[in-house]
Amino acid sequence: MQVAYHWQVISRLLIALLRVYKLVISPLLGPRCRFAPSCSDYAMTAIGRFGPLRGSWLAARRLGRCHPFHPGGFDPVPDAPASPSPSSSCSCKGPHP
């Protein structure tokens, strides 16, 4: 339980830093992102959906694609995988309680 709380705190901290970037730094630089949603919006959604580790990895990959030689366009955050039901991972033939 304590570990999950720490990951949640880290996620909130990263999202807060991204919001500060959007409010303070981004207006000074002007719109530069080739994608929709913007890279900062993508990062906030990815961290909120997947947590700080995988969300940051997805955001870093997205930033790596954000350059003049990439066409850009619509690039949403992938959907979170559905949690498997207990019966889908079981190979037995009997009913489940």
UniProtKB/Swiss-Prot annotation:
Family per record: Belongs to the UPF0161 family.
Keywords annotated in UniProt: Cell inner membrane, Cell membrane, Membrane
Protein name: Putative membrane protein insertion efficiency factor
Function: Could be involved in insertion of integral membrane proteins into the membrane.
PANTHER family to which the protein is assigned, alphabetical: MEMBRANE PROTEIN INSERTION EFFICIENCY FACTOR-RELATED (PTHR33383:SF1)
Entry keyword annotation includes Hydrolase: no
First-listed, main subcellular location of the protein, grouped into a coarse class: membrane
Domain of life of the source: Bacteria
Lineage: Bacteria, Pseudomonadati, Pseudomonadota, Gammaproteobacteria, Lysobacterales
Membrane topology reported for the UniProt record: Peripheral membrane protein
Low complexity bias (residue ranges): 85-97
InterPro entries associated with the record: Membr_insert_effic_factor_YidD (IPR002696)
Span list, region Disordered: 77-97
Cellular component GO terms held in the UniProt record: plasma membrane
Segments crossing the lipid bilayer: none
Location of this chain's protein in the cell: Cell inner membrane
